[in-house]
Amino acid sequence: MRRTALVLTASAPEGRASELAQFPSAVPAPHPPPVSLPSPTAAPGFAMGNVPSAVKHCLSYQQLLREHLWIGDSVAGALDPAQETSQLSGLPEFVKIVEVGPRDGLQNEKVIVPTDIKIEFINRLSQTGLSVIEVTSFVSSRWVPQVAAGATEISVFGAASESFSKKNINCSIEESMGKFEEVVKSARHMNIPARGYVSCALGCPYEGSITPQKVTEVSKRLYGMGCYEISLGDTIGVGTPGSMKRMLESVMKEIPPGALAVHCHDTYGQALANILTALQMGINVVDSAVSGLGGCPYAKGASGNVATEDLVYMLNGLGLNTGVNLYKVMEAGDFICKAVNKTTNSKVAQASFNA
């Protein structure tokens, strides 16, 4: 049986963390309002959101949806992987998706999301086949009051930019490394895996361009202290396939691709292209957020993460296995968007729900 890891991120290295409450993952949440979605087995002709009517009634379009989108209990696309991957080289057979919506997504909301809504949201995500879900962060309530919980894995947040490090975690890069070492060491003693993040890997809102060498140095430090995986974040979404390739080439001289992940925001619409570039270079772990939730309180103008729905749709189309049920991800996204009264940023969801 697939197990879902609930991840706690550590973003307050100077001891300003609020008191933690154990996350009640097994506590039944109140029944939410029913989600209105077309059935995965719906007959041809069901409404498809903002897709033009003429296209909706095209038989070939409906066939595409039956094979490629409404995959029911399937964990991979219905298309033949041999047919799809023959067009692109170097792609992994399996891609692990790290869902960051509950943590990175909800931290940017202006209102505090009620605990029962968070629990129901996470419970829904845990039923999608996602193997890793970041549920929250522990940080000072003075800085980011929206998050509080506990988990079975931790992450630490470094940065390749001095200015961003001071804005985001209130200390220099060097100071943060010392704090992170203590956290990772303590986690290892408790047999809790630690993941390392490098923010601003492709650009900084305060310093502009970041050199690949700087990203490599921070990544090497995190990997050396015991982080089993390093997630390289395009925090403000300014990267392109070219800059992604150059950055990864540098980092991969020090860290094997099997220990790397990418975390792309979609500010300039480049997230999926950047992810595809990373996959072709041997990366097989990708962070995403359902409905494209997110942003960063300390990176003004940055849009949300790449939408999990859009990522899974692309990976299905490439014939790659993710273990994720796209239909159930869309249900979870619809639930949280209604709960926080916002419109989904997922193109797949926008094209799939009733207008």
Predicted feature descriptions by range:
Residues 1-355:
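Catalytic cores and adjacent flexible loops of soluble metabolic enzymes
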